[in-house]
């Protein structure tokens, strides 16, 4: 016979109460945790960002489409179609004529320099294990910040465009033809009036897109393009629906004359996609990145619309756009630049005295660093990191061809391959696909990117390497060994240029020994660091600035990686957490998609509180009822035993 005394009964109630409190505690902690560490099924994940009590972004807190107005005292700083800045003095023309300053007679022509210095027989993988995402993000960021169009008759009023075609001798090993030929080169468009032959008037160039990291590569830099890209329904951007997933909107020039212009070379323009930047179709890897961030915008827009059913299309669009811009900024500053070995000073606050305008030295020289980091192979891999059925691509097979995305598996295989492959070392050498066969075979439109990069620097009046260094406060070099410890490169420079003060700035920067723990030489490192510091500190709406209406989200945005965006917008299930470093072991690709909850630290609205209260009360009452029933049943059993 059981002796169920008052002490035992008290203990029972005590334990039951503890159980109730424990369950309630677990309920609250699971409901309001900031970040869940447990991976979830991607198909079941519809809300990676949960932003409570959102408010629409006011007009004054939005990035304007053309980049103007961020600085109230200097509203044109960073705006599209404004003059690029210049840190170093212009290269002096021998005859004093500004129209021919590019025609240097004291050094070989750019193709000769390319053949003598930039030819590479064997690719050397990056010594710091950087992946192909480094050069790709560099290209994506370049198209986000600067675009100087050329006088090719399509983008300039001149019927007779200003040219500086590059001679190719008939004995050229790769491009030679009997009688020789010229590689086409159109000079950059100039700011109105700067083509005056008066030597006192300098020839300057406009940046036709915004300087800011403001998502212009996704949203455009002018009203016509920006409006065309929008769906004007639920804050979304236009897409094309393919079996491979949502892709960019298709160009349809025949039926829609308002379709924004895109760059075409060697393929039917009706096959192209339309993006915020006109160069999106240049390569399938670049196109994949464009698609990724349009998907991210629409994902954000859908979730913002679901949480805020009363918001207008414009309010949803601008909020999603602002977060997407913040993601581009954080990937650039907290993943891309550190992968190059560039560590900026900690962000303090917006500084209205800083001019962020893109400089000539950055645009046409230093930030072309990625051109030597592009290899000849374009890997495409399945979920097990094996080649897909259609196989890998060569780099040149990816130029202006969208079929690898539209017909051969979408962007997933490309994004996996980029994370797997180690990019070439940043050095003086260019891949053969870029140096002899860019956009086509030799004699059939094929170009030499190294020669074009050199000629573009001369076209923009960039002075010699030592003068550029001096302009940025760096010491001039006296000997070839000061530039590089590589004896072979020293000999190439010595045999190509008459003296150390004649070296093209681009070649000098590529030849430099790297800064310790960096992928860059000193000059390139210094110029890139300077430009990105000015872009950040001179941006009133930078996501870390307290002027930004997403300021309260800064820590969550800062902790978002490119891997996160890939995982939540593609079929990819596993990838390394830092995709800027290559990983070739499948078991190390352990960055799975987490259910990240972003809160701006504002209290939930009244409807949220009411719902939480009702659910909690129901939960507690249910538990109390269960406990009471258990106690009653136990007491009945005791009474029966006592009667026996």
Model-derived segments and their meaning:
Residues 1-39, 603-644:
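Secretory targeting signatures
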Residues 38-299, 303, 322, 326-451, ...:
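N-terminal accessory/cap region of cofactor-dependent oxidoreductases and related radical enzymes
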Residues 459, 471-474, 482-483:
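Folded extracytoplasmic luminal domains of secretory or organellar precursors
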Residues 484-488, 641-643:
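A glycine-rich phosphate-binding loop feature that marks nucleotide/adenosyl-phosphate handling sites
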Residues 306-308:
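Metallocofactor- and cofactor-centric catalytic cores in central/energy metabolism, strongly enriched
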Residues 315-319:
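Short, charged, amphipathic alpha-helical segments
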Residues 312:
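Acidic, glycine-enriched active-site microenvironments
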């Amino acid at each position: 016979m059981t002796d169920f005394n008052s002490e035992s009964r008290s203990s029972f109630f005590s334990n039951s109460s503890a159980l109730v409190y424990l369950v309630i505690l677990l309920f609250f902690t699971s409901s309001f945790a900031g970040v869940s560490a447990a991976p979830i099924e991607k198909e079941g994940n519809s809300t990676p960002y949960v932003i409570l009590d959102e408010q629409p972004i006011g007009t004054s807190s939005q990035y304007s489409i053309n980049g103007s107005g961020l600085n109230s005292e200097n509203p044109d700083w960073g705006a599209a179609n404004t003059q690029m800045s210049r840190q170093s003095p212009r290269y002096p023309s021998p005859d004093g004529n500004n129209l021919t300053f590019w025609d240097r007679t004291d050094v070989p022509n750019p193709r000769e320099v390319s053949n003598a210095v930039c030819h590479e027989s064997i690719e050397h993988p990056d010594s710091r294990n950087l992946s192909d995402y480094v050069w790709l993000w560099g290209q994506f960021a370049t198209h986000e910040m600067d675009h100087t169009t050329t006088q090719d008759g399509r983008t300039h009023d001149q019927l007779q465009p200003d040219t500086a075609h590059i001679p190719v001798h008939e004995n050229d090993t790769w491009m030679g033809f009997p009688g020789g030929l010229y590689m086409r080169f159109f000079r950059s468009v100039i700011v109105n009036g700067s083509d005056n032959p008066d030597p006192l008037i300098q020839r300057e160039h406009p940046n036709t897109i915004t300087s800011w990291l403001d998502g212009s590569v996704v949203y455009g830099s002018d009203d016509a393009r920006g409006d065309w890209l929008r769906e004007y329904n639920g804050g979304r951007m236009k897409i094309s629906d393919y079996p491979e997933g949502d892709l960019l909107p298709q160009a349809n020039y025949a039926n829609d004359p308002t379709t924004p212009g895109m760059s075409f070379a060697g393929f039917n323009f009706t096959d192209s996609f339309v993006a915020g930047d006109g160069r999106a179709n240049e390569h399938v890897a670049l196109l994949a990145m464009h698609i990724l961030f349009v998907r991210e915008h629409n994902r954000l827009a859908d979730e913002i619309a679901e949480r805020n059913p009363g918001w207008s299309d414009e309010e949803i669009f601008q909020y999603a756009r602002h977060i997407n811009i913040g993601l581009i900024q954080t990937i650039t500053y907290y993943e891309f630049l550190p992968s190059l070995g560039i560590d900026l000073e900690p962000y303090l606050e917006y500084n209205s005295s800083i001019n962020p305008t893109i400089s000539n030295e950055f645009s046409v020289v230093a930030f072309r660093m990625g051109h030597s980091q592009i290899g000849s192979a374009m890997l495409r891999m399945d979920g097990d990191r094996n080649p897909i059925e259609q196989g890998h691509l060569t780099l040149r097979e990816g130029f202006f061809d969208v079929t690898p995305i539209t017909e051969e598996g979408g962007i997933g295989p490309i994004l996996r391959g980029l994370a797997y492959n180690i990019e070439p070392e940043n050095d003086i050498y260019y891949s053969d696909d870029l140096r002899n066969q860019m956009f086509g075979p030799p004699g059939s439109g094929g170009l030499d990117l190294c020669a074009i990069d050199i000629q573009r620097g001369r076209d923009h009046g960039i002075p010699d390497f030592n003068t550029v260094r001096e302009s940025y406060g760096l010491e001039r070099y006296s000997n070839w060994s000061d530039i590089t410890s590589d004896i072979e490169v020293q000999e190439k420079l010595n045999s190509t240029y008459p003296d150390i003060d004649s070296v093209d700035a681009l070649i000098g920067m590529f030849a430099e020994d790297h800064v310790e723990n960096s992928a860059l030489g000193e000059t390139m490192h210094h110029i890139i660091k300077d430009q990105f510091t000015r872009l950040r500190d001179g941006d009133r709406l930078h996501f870390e600035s307290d002027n930004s209406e997403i300021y309260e989200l800064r820590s969550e945005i800062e902790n978002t990686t490119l891997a996160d965006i890939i995982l939540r917008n593609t079929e990819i299930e596993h990838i390394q957490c830092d995709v800027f470093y290559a990983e070739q072991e499948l078991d190390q690709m352990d960055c799975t998609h987490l259910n990240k909850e972003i809160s701006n630290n504002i209290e939930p609205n009244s409807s949220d509180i009411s719902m939480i209260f009702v659910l909690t009360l129901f939960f507690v009452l249910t538990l109390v009822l269960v406990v009471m029933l258990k106690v009653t049943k136990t007491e009945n059993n005791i009474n029966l035993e006592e009667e026996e």
